[in-house]
């Protein structure tokens, strides 16, 4: 697995942000999908695993809490 969650990360920058003139509020659902993917990645591979597409586990946990997301959301 070379870059877990790359599809979700690219959807944010490559499509959503460009389409909405970099207004991240309009991309909330796509950003949530990335965070959920990253949460699953860390759950499956351990918190010492890394992906250039995912924030570090401690930051991811904070972001998910701020957005009221749980790892089982989809």
UniProtKB/Swiss-Prot annotation:
Its main location: mitochondrion. A motif (Cx9C motif) lies at residues 27-37. Coiled coil: none annotated. Residues 2-45 form the CHCH domain. It comes from the Eukaryota. Disulfide bonds join 5-37, 16-27. A motif (Cx10C motif) lies at residues 5-16. Keywords: Disulfide bond, Mitochondrion, Repeat. The keyword S-adenosyl-L-methionine does not apply. It is found in: Mitochondrion intermembrane space. InterPro entries: CMC4, Cys_alpha_HP_mot_SF. The keyword Repeat applies. GO terms for cellular component: mitochondrial intermembrane space. Transmembrane segments: none annotated. PANTHER family: CX9C MOTIF-CONTAINING PROTEIN 4. The twin Cx9C motifs are involved in the recognition by the mitochondrial disulfide relay system. Belongs to the CMC4 family. This is Cx9C motif-containing protein 4, mitochondrial. It comes from Saccharomyces cerevisiae (strain JAY291). The gene is CMC4.
């Amino acid at each position: 697995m070379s870059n877990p969650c790359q599809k979700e990360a690219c959807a944010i920058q490559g499509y959503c942000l460009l389409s909405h003139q970099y207004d991240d509020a309009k991309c909330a659902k796509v950003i949530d999908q990335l965070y959920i993917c990253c949460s699953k990645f860390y759950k499956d591979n351990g918190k010492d695993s890394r992906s250039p597409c995912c924030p570090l586990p401690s930051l991811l946990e904070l972001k998910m809490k701020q957005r009221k997301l749980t790892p089982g959301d989809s």
